């Protein structure tokens, strides 16, 4: 079973529809035991770092997520929450992946938030990359990003480079929305769900 963490009341229709198309058995949940028993865990996120961390704390999930051994995927804000710290609201995050979510630099031709399609530049071979290449585009909506590349699987160029896909151990992050990224996003989600679970 796939646990989709739902602590914020956000509209998760696009993500759940994508999982349905992939034939995944999933549950929207904030129950610690259900999350711990899941084969894969997805942490979506819309809003601010403070609201995201507050919601996780109020539901008693911070230590639960930190001790998971199965694959965990953070999407958009969910990826940023996996990091050590976010400049947005100056708030400590889960600390599962080294790095800081920093505000993107705005330029005349590169407004912030970064909204729209952009392509991935894969840095390391990964099971997530199977069936994909550097000509593939995905859909972004964000103002903050991980600029460091220590654990980057894929990077993206938007006036400055940032990490688009990150991995450390069983913790994965995608700064873009795979569920809104057409066929490429479906391949990425399917590749994640195909990762072996150690739960």
Swiss-Prot record:
One Pfam family of this chain: GATase
Matching Gene3D superfamilies: 3.40.50.880
Active site: 76, 177, 179
Disulfide bonds: none
Reaction equation(s) it catalyzes: 5-[(5-phospho-1-deoxy-D-ribulos-1-ylimino)methylamino]-1-(5-phospho-beta-D-ribosyl)imidazole-4-carboxamide + L-glutamine = D-erythro-1-(imidazol-4-yl)glycerol 3-phosphate + 5-amino-1-(5-phospho-beta-D-ribosyl)imidazole-4-carboxamide + L-glutamate + H(+); L-glutamine + H2O = L-glutamate + NH4(+)
CDD domains: GATase1_IGP_Synthase
GO MF annotations in UniProt: glutaminase activity; imidazoleglycerol-phosphate synthase activity; lyase activity
Transmembrane intervals: none
Gene Ontology CC: one annotated term: cytoplasm
EC number(s) reported in the record: 4.3.2.10, 3.5.1.2
Function: IGPS catalyzes the conversion of PRFAR and glutamine to IGP, AICAR and glutamate. The HisH subunit provides the glutamine amidotransferase activity that produces the ammonia necessary to HisF for the synthesis of IGP and AICAR.
Subunit annotation: Heterodimer of HisH and HisF.
Name by which UniProt lists this protein: Imidazole glycerol phosphate synthase subunit HisH 2
Native source organism of the sequence: Legionella pneumophila subsp. pneumophila (strain Philadelphia 1 / ATCC 33152 / DSM 7513)
């Amino acid at each position: 079973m796939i646990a989709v963490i739902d602590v914020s009341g956000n509209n998760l229709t696009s993500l759940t529809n994508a999982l349905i198309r992939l034939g995944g058995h999933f549950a929207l949940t904030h129950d610690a035991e259900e999350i711990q028993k899941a084969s894969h865990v997805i942490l979506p996120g819309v809003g601010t770092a403070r609201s995201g961390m507050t919601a996780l704390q109020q539901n008693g999930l911070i230590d639960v997520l930190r001790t998971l051994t199965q694959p965990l995927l953070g999407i958009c804000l969910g990826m940023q929450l996996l990091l050590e710290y976010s400049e947005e609201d100056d708030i400590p995050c889960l600390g599962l992946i080294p790095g800081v979510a920093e505000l993107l630099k705005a330029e005349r031709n590169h407004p912030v938030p970064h909204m729209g399609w952009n392509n991935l530049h894969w840095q390391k071979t990964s099971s997530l990359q199977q069936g994909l290449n550097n000509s593939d585009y995905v859909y972004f909506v964000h103002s903050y990003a991980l600029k460091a590349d220590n654990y980057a699987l894929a990077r993206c160029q938007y006036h400055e480079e940032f990490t688009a896909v990150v991995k450390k151990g069983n913790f994965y992050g995608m700064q873009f929305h795979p569920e809104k990224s057409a066929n490429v996003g479906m391949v990425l989600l399917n590749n994640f769900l195909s990762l072996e679970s150690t739960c």
